[in-house]
From Swiss-Prot:
Residue segments, region Disordered: 53-72
Domain of life (superkingdom): Bacteria
Record organism: Shigella flexneri
Protein name per UniProt: Protein SlyX
HAMAP family: SlyX
Residue runs in coiled coils: none
Gene3D superfamilies (UniProt xref): 1.20.5.300
Residue ranges with Polar residues bias: 55-65
Family: Belongs to the SlyX family.
Pfam families for the chain: SlyX
Length: 72
């Protein structure tokens, strides 16, 4: 009777392991897809930031245009 119980427990553990392996593989695929999407979004954000900077003049004068402080 104990052998049957051990066999049943072993079968249950093997079943759980197989399920976990499938789940891990599915999660791996999902994470890889998210990484690709985030890379695309970073590229788009960089391009939009560059376009925004190019289209709007800055209100801050460059250091060469700034007058020196009064103590100079």
């Amino acid at each position: 009777m104990q052998d049957l119980s051990l066999e049943a427990r072993l079968a249950e553990l093997e079943s759980r392991l197989a399920f976990q392996e499938i789940t891990i593989e599915e999660l791996n695929v999902t994470v890889a897809a998210h990484e690709m999407e985030m890379a695309k979004l970073r590229d788009h954000l960089r391009l939009l930031t560059e376009k925004l900077k190019a289209s709007q003049p800055s209100n801050i004068a460059s250091q060469a245009e700034e007058t020196p402080p009064p103590h100079y």
